């Protein structure tokens, strides 16, 4: 197993649709690894993680806007392609960052974060 630190763009990180948080959901279905990167699966996974009105990640959104990204708590990933990685640990943080990136792209306030953070 490959270990170490990598730096990649947020767009290269795929949320895990088989996250243990989803198993008890009535609308949960197991997703095969070769389908994880599909847009509709990633959108559904992001919706699961965000919750209604972003209630599941609002604390992280506010923390990132105030404190930026804390380097001492890296997101753990598994390589599943040349430049794609599935998030193993840190799906909520990744979801919050993806939402903040979307806000940045629409010229909304993202606090202390900068384009390079995405």
Where are these regions (language model features)?
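Short, charged/polar connector segments at secondary-structure boundaries
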Residues: 1-116
